[in-house]
Amino acid sequence: MTAYVVFVRNEVTDAEEMKQYQAKAPLAREGRTLKPLAFYGAVETLEGQAVEGAVILEFPDVAEAHAWYDSPAYQDALQHRLKGADDRVFVIEGLPG
């Protein structure tokens, strides 16, 4: 079943760390089956606290989403995002069929 990884950016706290993340994160997509559906486009908050941005990535299934997230390439990039931004990231299964 299709799965989606959703990033919700609350705030960038260290621009230099985020530059490192932005340089390294694309390397983790190489050889992976994923499709960016939304990538820091215009965000309009309809309810709740406003966010700085959001990303939605589509994967064939939850296992592939975890394989990408847990990969050495993404983990190398992740350390910089964790130091450079306040984000929420989660995986959610799509609907069947």
Report residues per predicted region.
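C-terminal structural segments of small proteins and small subunits
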Residues: H66-F90
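Short S/T/G/P-rich N-terminal loop/turn motif that feeds into the first structured element of a domain
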Residues: M1-G53, P60-D70, E93-G97
